[in-house]
A protein has these predicted regions:
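Extracytoplasmic/secretory ectodomains and luminal regions
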Residues: 1-96
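C-terminal amphipathic alpha-helix
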Residues: 86, 90-153
Length: 153
């Protein structure tokens, strides 16, 4: 396999991980919006277990999101104030690999392995979120919670 092919495959792996991170983020952010809406509709005490799990899941989403991106960054100057998170570190590595002439350096490979391990650790939080959402959906069905509220009743 040529150095250019190895570099291309390596860059594809990095790109796939970045795509996986952003896909997971979109799903978590959508789930958080839905859970926020659900909480506003479940004010009855009989739904307290659902609400508790929902609140824990939102907290887990917030914590996981913060490890992946810097949600507080709003302008280019915020890079100074807020630490780059995993997405920016992957993008930085991709940029460095793309800008270098093959072969891939051992430092780039080591950095990728470190970032990949970090992503896999963080992904356990995402997996727990998915599991919590399945539990919430089961509890909603068991509790006969109406899918569409009747205007805040």
């Amino acid at each position: 396999m040529s150095h250019f092919t190895k570099k291309s495959d390596f860059m594809k792996n990095i790109h796939d991980d970045i795509s996986d991170i952003y896909s997971s983020l979109r799903k978590m952010q959508s789930a958080r919006d839905q859970l926020d809406d659900l909480e506003s509709r479940l004010l009855d005490v009989k739904f307290s277990k659902i609400l508790e799990l929902s609140k824990r899941t939102i907290k887990l989403i917030d914590d996981t999101e913060f490890k992946l991106i810097s949600p507080k960054q709003k302008t280019f100057q915020d890079v100074i104030n807020f630490r780059n998170q995993l997405d920016a570190q992957f993008l930085d590595l991709l940029s460095k690999v793309d800008g270098n002439v093959p072969p891939i350096t051992s430092g780039e490979m080591t950095r990728y392995k470190d970032l990949k391990l970090e992503w896999l650790k963080i992904k356990t939080g995402y997996d727990q979120i998915v599991s919590n959402i399945q539990d919430i959906n089961t509890k909603l069905i068991e509790s006969s919670v109406p899918f569409i509220s009747r205007g805040g009743e």
